[in-house]
C-alpha cells in the first residue's frame, strides 16, 4: 500500500518499480506505480478537499503544519537514515537535510506573512485591502538529490496558503516520500489535502497533463522543465514554477589563503557527489605561477577526498551517486571531454561495479573549442585558465543556464565588478556556491528557471493577490459626476 489517496493507503495498479540502495544494491522499497486513473482519483480527492482546507483559516492550517514539524522532530533520525539509504549520501549530510525540513516550517510561516499576508490602508476611494488566495490544486514533482527537503519546500508553503497537493516524488526515492506522508498523516492532516502518487514517467505525465490541477511546482532537469514549460505555454491560467539546475561557474582571483580557497572549491564542486543543482561545474583559474600553485594544492586535496557508502565509519565526505547508471554517465562525460581535447588532472573513476560510487574528477578544458554547455550532474569539475578578469567573466557567462555563480577574491572591488556583470540568481563571494540561505529566494535565470524563485519566495507562487476597495456601507459621493442626476 504505497499510494496515499483521499487519506487512505492503497496499492498501485501499474507496473512494478523498485528502489535500490546505490551503494550496495540492497532493495529498499518495492511496489507498483500509480496508473493514470489513480492519478485522476488523487486530483479529484485534492479538489474535493481544497475549499474546506482553505476555509479552515491560516491558524487552523498552521496548527497541522506545526504538528507535522513536531513529527519530523520526533522522527528525524529515521528520516535521515531513509534518505541516506535511498540516495547513498553519507549520514552527516542526510542529518542536515532532515534538520532543514524542520527549519523550513518556521521559514515558510515567516514568508507567508511577509510575502502573501493581508494588509490594508485608507485611500480617498475607500479602504484598500490586499489579500492572497490559493490557486487550488497544485502538483509537486520532487527530485532525488534532496528527496525530503526540496519537495517539502514546495508542499509546506502550498498548504499554508490553502492549496491542496498531489505529490509525485522521484521514482528513485519513493521511500522518503512514503515516510513524509506517514508523518503528515500522524499530524492529523485531513483526507485529500496531500495525495501521494508513486511512479515513473507515465505517472508524471498523467499528473502534469491533468486538466484539474491549477499549478505545478517542479525541481529537476532542464530537459524535463522545458518540456513542461512548452506544455503549459498554452494554458496561462496555471502557475508553473521551475527550478532546473545549472552549469555553474566559480572564479578564483588573487586569494591569499589558498588552503581556504581549495576548501571552498571542494565544497562547491564535490559535496553530495556533485549532485546539487548549485554545484560548481566550471572553475576559472588565472594563468601563471599563482594559478599553477593553487591547482597543485587542489589536485592533492581532491586525491585525499574520502568516498564510501552512506553508513561507512569514519564517515566519508562523498557518498554514492544516485545509481550505477548515473556513475557510468559521469565516466562517459569525462571521456567525451577528453575526446574534445581536454586534459585530465584527477581522473574520475567508477570505484565499484554495480554501485554509484565514483571518485571525484578534475579536468582541464582550457582551449577546448566546442565545450558542451551541459550540466554534468556529478563530481567532475572543469578547469579553465584565464588571462584577465574580463575574459573570465565573459567565459563564466557563456552558458544558457544561470543558477549559481561565485568568486573567491580578497578584493571587494573585484567582487562588485563581478556581481554587476555575472548572470545568475545566486551569486556568492568567498563562500561555497552550494551554500544558500532558506531565508532568501532560491532560483536562477535562463535555462535554470522561469522566474519563480523558491525557498523564501515560494510563498509568491503558492498564492495570487486579490486587491479590494471596500466600504462598510453604500454611500453617495459628495458630488455626482457630470451628466448624472439622482
Swiss-Prot record:
GO biological process, one term: arginine catabolic process to glutamate
Residues bound to NAD(+): 220-225
Family per record: Belongs to the aldehyde dehydrogenase family. AstD subfamily.
Reactions it catalyzes: N-succinyl-L-glutamate 5-semialdehyde + NAD(+) + H2O = N-succinyl-L-glutamate + NADH + 2 H(+)
Pathway: Amino-acid degradation; L-arginine degradation via AST pathway; L-glutamate and succinate from L-arginine: step 4/5
Keyword Oxidoreductase attached: yes
Source species: Shewanella halifaxensis (strain HAW-EB4)
Active site: 243, 277
Superkingdom: Bacteria
GO MF term (any one): succinylglutamate-semialdehyde dehydrogenase activity
Keywords: Arginine metabolism, NAD, Oxidoreductase
Protein name per UniProt: N-succinylglutamate 5-semialdehyde dehydrogenase
InterPro entries, A to Z: Ald_DH/histidinol_DH, Ald_DH_C, Ald_DH_CS_CYS, Ald_DH_CS_GLU, Ald_DH_N, Aldehyde_DH_dom, SuccinylGlu_semiald_DH_AstD
Enzyme Commission code(s) on record: 1.2.1.71
Keyword match Oxidoreductase: yes
Listed Pfam families: Aldedh (PF00171)
Cited function: Catalyzes the NAD-dependent reduction of succinylglutamate semialdehyde into succinylglutamate.
Amino acid at each position: 500500500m504505497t499510494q496515499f489517496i483521499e487519506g487512505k493507503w492503497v496499492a498501485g495498479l501499474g507496473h512494478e518499480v523498485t528502489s535500490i540502495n546505490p551503494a550496495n544494491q540492497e532493495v529498499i522499497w518495492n511496489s507498483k506505480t500509480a496508473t493514470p486513473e489513480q492519478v485522476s482519483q488523487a486530483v479529484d480527492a485534492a479538489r474535493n478537499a481544497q475549499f474546506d482546507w482553505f476555509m479552515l483559516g491560516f491558524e487552523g492550517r498552521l496548527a497541522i503544519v506545526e504538528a507535522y514539524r513536531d513529527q519530523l522532530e520526533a522522527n528525524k533520525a529515521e528520516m535521515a537514515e531513509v534518505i541516506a539509504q535511498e540516495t547513498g549520501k553519507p549520514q552527516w549530510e542526510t542529518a542536515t537535510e532532515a534538520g532543514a525540513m524542520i527549519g523550513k516550517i518556521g521559514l515558510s510561516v515567516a514568508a507567508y506573512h511577509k510575502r502573501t499576508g493581508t494588509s490594508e490602508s485608507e485611500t480617498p476611494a475607500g479602504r484598500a485591502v490586499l489579500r492572497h488566495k490559493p490557486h487550488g490544486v497544485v502538483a509537486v514533482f520532487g527530485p532525488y538529490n534532496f528527496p525530503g527537503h526540496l519537495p517539502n519546500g514546495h508542499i509546506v508553503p502550498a498548504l499554508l496558503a490553502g492549496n491542496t497537493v498531489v505529490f509525485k516524488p522521484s521514482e528513485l526515492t519513493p521511500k522518503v516520500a512514503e515516510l513524509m506522508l506517514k508523518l503528515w498523516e500522524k499530524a492529523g492532516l485531513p483526507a485529500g489535502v496531500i495525495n501521494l502518487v508513486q511512479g515513473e514517467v507515465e505517472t508524471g505525465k498523467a499528473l502534469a497533463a491533468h486538466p484539474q490541477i491549477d499549478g505545478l511546482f517542479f525541481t529537476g532537469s532542464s530537459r524535463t522543465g522545458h518540456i513542461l514549460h512548452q506544455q503549459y505555454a498554452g494554458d496561462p491560467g496555471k502557475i508553473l514554477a521551475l527550478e532546473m539546475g545549472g552549469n555553474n561557474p566559480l572564479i578564483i582571483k588573487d586569494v591569499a589563503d589558498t588552503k581556504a580557497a581549495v576548501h571552498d572549491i571542494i565544497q562547491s564542486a564535490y559535496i553530495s557527489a556533485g549532485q546539487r543543482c548549485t554545484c560548481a561545474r566550471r572553475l576559472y583559474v588565472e594563468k601563471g605561477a599563482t594559478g599553477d600553485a593553487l591547482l597543485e594544492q587542489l589536485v592533492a586535496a581532491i586525491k585525499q577526498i574520502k568516498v564510501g557508502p552512506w553508513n561507512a565509519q569514519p564517515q566519508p565526505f562523498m557518498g554514492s551517486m544516485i545509481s550505477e547508471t548515473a556513475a557510468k554517465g559521469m565516466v562517459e562525460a569525462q571521456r567525451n571531454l577528453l575526446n574534445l581535447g581536454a586534459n585530465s588532472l584527477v581522473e574520475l573513476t567508477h570505484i565499484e561495479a554495480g554501485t554509484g560510487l565514483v571518485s571525484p574528477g578534475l579536468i582541464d578544458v582550457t582551449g577546448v573549442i566546442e565545450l558542451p554547455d551541459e550540466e554534468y550532474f556529478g563530481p567532475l569539475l572543469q578547469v579553465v585558465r584565464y588571462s584577465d578578469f574580463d575574459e573570465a567573466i565573459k567565459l563564466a557567462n557563456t552558458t544558457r543556464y544561470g543558477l549559481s555563480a561565485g568568486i573567491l577574491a580578497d578584493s571587494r572591488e573585484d567582487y562588485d565588478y563581478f556581481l554587476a556583470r555575472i548572470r545568475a540568481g545566486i551569486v556568492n563571494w568567498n563562500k561555497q556556491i552550494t551554500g544558500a540561505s532558506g531565508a532568501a529566494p532560491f532560483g536562477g535565470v535562463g535555462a535554470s528557471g522561469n522566474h519563480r524563485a523558491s525557498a523564501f519566495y515560494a510563498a509568491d507562487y503558492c498564492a495570487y493577490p486579490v486587491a479590494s476597495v471596500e466600504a462598510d456601507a453604500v454611500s453617495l459621493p459628495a458630488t455626482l459626476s457630470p451628466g448624472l442626476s439622482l
